[in-house]
Amino acid sequence: MEKIVGLCKRRGFVFPSSEIYGGQGGVWDYGPMGIALKNNIAHAWWQDMTRLHDHIVGLDAAILMHPNVWRTSGHVDHFSDPLVDCTVCKSRFRADQVAVPSAGGPCPQCGGALTGVRNFNLMFSTHMGPTDERASLLYLRPETAQGIYVNYKNVLQTTRLKVPFGIAQIGKAFRNEIVTKNFIFRTCEFEQMEMQFFVRPAEDTHWFEYWCAQRWAFYQKYGVRMNHMRWRTHAAHELAHYARAACDIEYAFPMGFRELEGVHNRGDFDLTRHAQHSGKDLCYVDPDPNLDAAARRYVPCVVETSAGLTRCVLMFLCDAYTEEYVQAPNVAFSETTQTADQEGAARTGEMRIVLRLHPALSPTTVAFLPLVKKDGLVDLARAVRDELREDFACDFDAAGAIGKRYRRQDEVGTPFCVTVDYQSKEDDTVTVRLRDSMAQRRVSRAFLAEFLRTEIKHYRRP
């Protein structure tokens, strides 16, 4: 994990928040590369969920909601973790992460005596208005799903969708975690990508299995190494109070396999609870003429897909990070590689760090590099870049030797480098260098955009 953290700080992916004041523990800011990567992941998810399905629409619900939403959902009374404190060093731990989580047990930090277990509510509270009275108490949402449930009827009435249909949302959530650790894996402020799919009660198992397959295929599509992922099915005693079934997609992070995304069959729990406590009718009347009158009116069941956007950023960085040794023969701009563990590679080559991100996710798609900063090559390179910048995320780099510039682009995952040289002035061609293989192609300036689109469309990670 140290290498990932170092790369993120060095190349502008993630910074400690409020760093000039010493930083705020467990809170992070996303730099130029980080926000671009995060936005690209969110865009890919949004397209996969909404554009590729006729029956899924989007929503952006408020962070601050009526407190009764959280009372009804059970968060006010039950959204808590077991907590123990050390009576000596005052450290706090989740009870399930301590060897002896009971009063008098040893503190894993200093060996002092621990307190007994108590429940710690994970919701942040705030107040709306000029007073701090209980009547003005609000909560920062701990999840985005409830905003979808309370808008279910609004969406149904304004879109004329029919069951089965889904509502997708990307947004921030907040949890007052007892322990924040493992970089951006577990933080107090994070972003979720969730979709709630409303189905007939008799079809919940079918759609649960369908969305399990769809979500696995998403990560496969964007080049994640499948041998680093696995499914974990929740046993009956692990299921949340609302769930009929649950499966997690886990990824092999540096600290071990951890949850990346969950798919849950929530049954009709959420809509039924909100109907009871709000007094509103949230039943659906199915227009299918093949159903009898009694079966046509029901509360839909919900199949949920819930992914952490910030965890996805970390996962894609970990999965893409590669170290390899580069051998440079005496051929202009040519490079060959040996894997980092190949015998003799470290003695004879230079190590490069490369992020093998899918081109659709990379913060920069193509970098334009004039061979030298004279003879009009800089202006020509800028002109070629300007022809493509509306369609691709472009960078321009004229500082330093060409090999150093390649390395900088490798480290941030740029899949294509376009070198403009003296031949470019003669025949209007450029050299396109491919990140993963370091192979080079001479491409006509007129066909450069089409070449890049084709490479992106047919990209396969080596």
UniProtKB/Swiss-Prot annotation:
It is found in: Cytoplasm. Its EC number is 6.1.1.14. Substrate binds at residues 94, 143, 190-194, 304-308. InterPro entries: aa-tRNA-synt_IIb, aa-tRNA-synth_II, aa-tRNA-synth_II/BPL/LPL, Anticodon-bd, Anticodon-bd_dom_sf, Gly-tRNA_synthase/POLG2, Gly_tRNA_ligase_bac, GlyRS-like_core. Pfam families: HGTP_anticodon, tRNA-synt_2b. Keywords: Aminoacyl-tRNA synthetase, ATP-binding, Cytoplasm, Ligase, Nucleotide-binding, Protein biosynthesis. PROSITE patterns: AA_TRNA_LIGASE_II. GO terms for cellular component: cytoplasm. SUPFAM superfamilies: Class II aaRS ABD-related, Class II aaRS and biotin synthetases. It catalyses: tRNA(Gly) + glycine + ATP = glycyl-tRNA(Gly) + AMP + diphosphate. One of its GO terms (molecular function) is glycine-tRNA ligase activity. Gene3D superfamilies: Anticodon-binding domain, Bira Bifunctional Protein, Domain 2. GO terms for biological process: glycyl-tRNA aminoacylation. ATP binds at residues 175-177, 185-190, 259-260, 308-311. The keyword Nucleotide-binding applies. Homodimer. HAMAP family: Gly_tRNA_synth_B (MF_00253_B). Belongs to the class-II aminoacyl-tRNA synthetase family. Catalyzes the attachment of glycine to tRNA(Gly). This is Glycine--tRNA ligase.
